[in-house]
Regions:
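Thiamine diphosphate
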Residues: 1-172
Length: 172
């Protein structure tokens, strides 16, 4: 499942997981989308085939990214557009307690090292005994810079030509 915006992505993920209980379902959500739709985590029919990654930067970072019109307002964008400091202001306890109290396995990461310590557990192909939430704490400056780097990557002409040939002739 997938889409754009905050309207029901977590609920859609849960519905898909109920329809196919033998498959593992992954969802990646920003904090605004997650908090908007988090009540579905308490659905009594949720199974152990759900994995949710929550990117918690404490605001709607897309409104602060270098390529969004809201970025022109700088810090004012946080207050009036990006909903900064909402839902516990990046609390390290709020989602942890909510998820654990509902029976989810809770994992967290605030650095690359911490992420590397938990990502294997989160992405295991094995069905686990509980659904999972992995909350990753980030900041909007790093996210915007990463987006800018990704959007401005250049591919060498040789690499493009090589890929075209592979597409036409197929892999070895």
């Amino acid at each position: 499942t997938g889409g754009f915006g905050i309207d029901g992505g977590v609920s859609s993920l849960m519905g898909a997981s109920l329809a196919s209980p033998d498959k593992i379902f992954f969802g990646i959500f920003g904090d605004l989308a997650f908090f908007y739709d988090m009540n579905v985590l308490g659905n009594r029919h949720v199974r152990h085939n759900v994995r949710i990654m929550l990117i918690n930067n404490g605001k709607g970072t897309e409104f602060r990214n270098y390529n969004h019109p809201g970025a022109q307002f700088g810090e004012d964008s946080d207050e009036y557009i990006a909903a900064a400091r909402h839902y516990g202001n990046k609390s390290h306890q709020l989602v942890k307690h909510y998820a654990e109290d509902l029976g989810y396995e809770y994992l967290t990461a605030s650095s690359k090292e911490e992420y590397l310590n938990v990502v294997e557990r989160f992405t295991t192909e094995e069905m686990t005994d509980r659904p999972m939430v992995l909350e990753v704490f980030t900041n909007n400056e790093d996210e915007s810079e990463a987006l800018k780097i990704i959007n401005t990557l250049q591919t060498s002409p040789d690499a493009v030509a090589k890929q075209l040939v592979k597409n036409v002739l197929g892999q070895k």
